[in-house]
Amino acid sequence: MSSLLRELIDIVNVAVISGGDWPQFEKQVIAQLPPGGNLAGLSLLPTCGTKFFRYSGQWTKIYSEDFTTSEKHQILSAFHEAISGAGIKPEKVWGDLIEDRGSQITYSALGQQAPLAEKVKWDPDYAKRKKIKNLLDALLSGFSVRMGGATSIDVTKPGIDKAYGIRKLTSILGISSKQMLYVGDALFPGGNDYPVEQAGVASIAVRDPEDTRRVVQTIIACLCDSLVEPQEKSLPRDHS
């Protein structure tokens, strides 16, 4: 997937928006990219777009919409109450359940270090997290509460979500949202990708990394095809 991402960056501007924090981006995105190439075409938006990083010789933070101390206390208290009220208690967890990411507080039902195989089978229909989210919506009416990934619930400041990140992309890069194509796995109501679709950005829903790989391969093929000169397209093929 990293080689595909590199290929895509060489053709078109690319932005990665995820619920993960900057250290995860460094490990899972930046460190995996093949060496060489121009990183100026890559924008990274951790914690659901509440942070923005761009490359200019080094990775630089453009903004970070951080919580105040009192907001953090309110959100953490609400999480503990909602989790208890929903009666959700996994048999085994891997690492901390709640992580303060500065501009986002994230609940990971099986823990931050849970194996992917365990995460994907824990709540495939989102039913467990919906119970918790419904309680959080009542407790945190002044915040954005979204489900993401396989086991997570993300809380950000009101209106500071992935759609906010898209608006920042349009203003910073000078690219209209009508020129964008978004790929995500939580485009349903309540998912952390849903605000992007609501903002009017053309979106493609994917199920898993392999599904995402196929979509990216198709995008690259279509973009490359559009760059071929008409006379080159009409050249006959040698079938010998």
Predicted features and spans:
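Short, well-ordered coil/turn elements that cap or connect secondary structure elements
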Residues: 9-11, 39, 140, 175-177, ...
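Short glycine-/acidic-enriched loop or helix-start segments at secondary-structure transitions
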Residues: 25-27, 56, 117, 192-193, ...
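Conserved acidic, metal-coordinating active-site core of Asp-based
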Residues: 90-181, 192
